[in-house]
Amino acid sequence: MSMVYINIFLAFILSLMGMLVYRSHLMSSLLCLEGMMLSLFVMMSVTILNNHLTLASMMPIVLLVFAACEAALGLSLLVMVSNTYGTDYVQNLNLLQC
């Protein structure tokens, strides 16, 4: 395993750990999720370029489209929650509260 793959995997693990540690704020969770998507995009692109897979060359673009949709939905949810409750705590997203 080359150092490039190890560094990308380490970036993914650090983003995942950040997602687990800073899960109380929605903005921190969204940033960690974007870090995970970015590391997956880079890993997929490097793997496709190294293996000369021409049929799978559209997969990183599809991943970027899903990441952009996820970011747009996450930011709209962040704006809605911050306008409604005044904070970005994830506990405010529980719909079962009275």
UniProtKB/Swiss-Prot annotation:
Keywords: Electron transport, Membrane, Mitochondrion, Mitochondrion inner membrane, NAD, Respiratory chain, Translocase, Transmembrane, Transmembrane helix, Transport, Ubiquinone. Its main location: mitochondrion. The chain crosses the membrane at residues 1-21, 29-49, 61-81. Signal peptide: none annotated. Pfam families: Oxidored_q2 (PF00420). One of its GO terms (cellular component) is respiratory chain complex I. InterPro entries: NADH_UbQ_OxRdtase_chain4L/K, NUOK/Mnh_C1-like. It catalyses: a ubiquinone + NADH + 5 H(+)(in) = a ubiquinol + NAD(+) + 4 H(+)(out). GO terms for biological process: ATP synthesis coupled electron transport. It is found in: Mitochondrion inner membrane. It comes from the Eukaryota. The keyword Acetylation does not apply. GO terms for molecular function: NADH dehydrogenase (ubiquinone) activity. Belongs to the complex I subunit 4L family. PANTHER family: NADH-UBIQUINONE OXIDOREDUCTASE CHAIN 4L (PTHR11434:SF0), NADH-UBIQUINONE OXIDOREDUCTASE SUBUNIT ND4L (PTHR11434). Core subunit of respiratory chain NADH dehydrogenase (Complex I) which is composed of 45 different subunits. Core subunit of the mitochondrial membrane respiratory chain NADH dehydrogenase (Complex I) which catalyzes electron transfer from NADH through the respiratory chain, using ubiquinone as an electron acceptor. Part of the enzyme membrane arm which is embedded in the lipid bilayer and involved in proton translocation. This is NADH-ubiquinone oxidoreductase chain 4L. It comes from Canis lupus familiaris. The lineage of its organism: Eukaryota, Metazoa, Chordata, Craniata, Vertebrata.
